[in-house]
Amino acid sequence: MAITYLKKSPKTSSTDDTKTTGIVQDLLKDIEKTKEQGCIELTKKFDKYDGEIVVSKERIEEIKKTLDQKTKDDIQFSYDRVRKFAEAQLKNYGQNFEVELSEGLYAGQKLVPVNTAGCYIPGGRYAHIASAVMSVTTAKVAGVKNIIACSPPKEGVGAHPTIVYTADLCGADVILNLGGVPAIAAMTNGLFKNPPADIIVGPGNQFVAEAKRILFGKVGIDLFAGPTEIGIIADAKADPEIVAVDLVGQAEHGYNSPCWLYTTSKELAEKVMKRVPELIAELPEVPRTNADAAWRDYGEVILCDTDEEMVKISDEYAPEHLEVQTENLKWFHERLTNYGSLFVGEETTVAYGDKCSGTNHILPTKGAGRYTGGLFVGKFIKTLSFQRMTKESTELVGAAAARISRYEGMEAHARTGDVRLKKYGYSCLLYTSPSPRD
């Protein structure tokens, strides 16, 4: 058994860029000192935008009136499905409970939404309407009270009108004309009269990703996101045209977007490798430039001897998006374990999940699918534990806790049990016994 690379990536997609880190650290330090004015000046510098940062209610109403109905209908279509899926997640995401662990000792958990979420919505190369739906809707369904949305402004316009419309529809309380590092810093530090975000979610470029990484700890984040990825598992029964189109569909995201094909059919692989450059050549300039570089530098075609090998290599790569176009779909679905989101069968495709089918498109990259999933209602919800006790239950629990503490050499811990045992009329070693380890 062996695998053969018919096309091997000459580069390794990486977000470990010391130059990016230095730039982002300097910008964050500047904003920490200059606050809102720093965000305003950097927005003028980077986005050539010098209008209001906070999108006004009047601007939102203006967009509602001027945006064409078909666009609004399509956004509503996406919103309805993403909301329905998020509601299903919430319904099945654990429960508040309390249980009696022993007589008089009760413990439980309580699910509590974070107070404030910051949602970053990219708007550089493309107007990512769907990212507004994915982040804001999921936070709203989770029960977050304050939702701040940020998206890069365009000169003289502000954030893209469809992004503003979508963020408002999905439940954003405030929308800011901010992008990049200033946006992440503003949401983290509670600028422009907003509370500081407890968590920041949403995709972005390397500067957004690095700002989130640096600020993680001060603020929660959804995940460390790298360039978007696609993996496709395909056998001899797959349609090479559809496989090729789907690879190109993700490659257009950016010059460093990996696209991988795992197949047991050399004939299919060769057809796909021939067709991909042809499809790229037919694209408009911006997506063509992105896709050409992505396929050239980060595209791989891996020939496997068996279905088991395809599962193994796919799980090693743990792609953000994974399509399965094979004869035995159920067999693969049951065995694959590492991916961000799975698209089972030719009938579905990554673009459906990216835009409107309901599952979230904010997903783990760079192999993180080995240990985490994508954005879901649970990212906005804290699972908090609690306990309460009767005085009678202290006799057993207090004594055991005191003994364990002394075994560990933690006398002050032990005495917190002793003082209660003494108060409630039970025997104890209050303040008298050194640790048995001494």
Predicted regions located by residue number:
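N-terminal Rossmann-like NAD(P)+-binding subdomain of aldehyde/semialdehyde dehydrogenases
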Residues: 1-115
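Conserved small-residue-rich beta-alpha loop and adjacent elements
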Residues: 99-165
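Conserved NAD(P)+-binding/catalytic subdomain of aldehyde/semialdehyde dehydrogenases
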Residues: 169-249, 253-258
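Short acidic-hydrophobic, aromatic-tinged amphipathic segments that line or gate anion-handling sites
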Residues: 175-179, 301-306
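Short loop-to-beta-strand entry elements in the cores of soluble alpha/beta enzymes
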Residues: 203, 223-234, 250-273, 291-302, ...
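C-terminal core of ALDH-fold dehydrogenases
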Residues: 315-427
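Conserved small/polar residues in nucleotide/adenosyl-binding loops
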Residues: 431-438
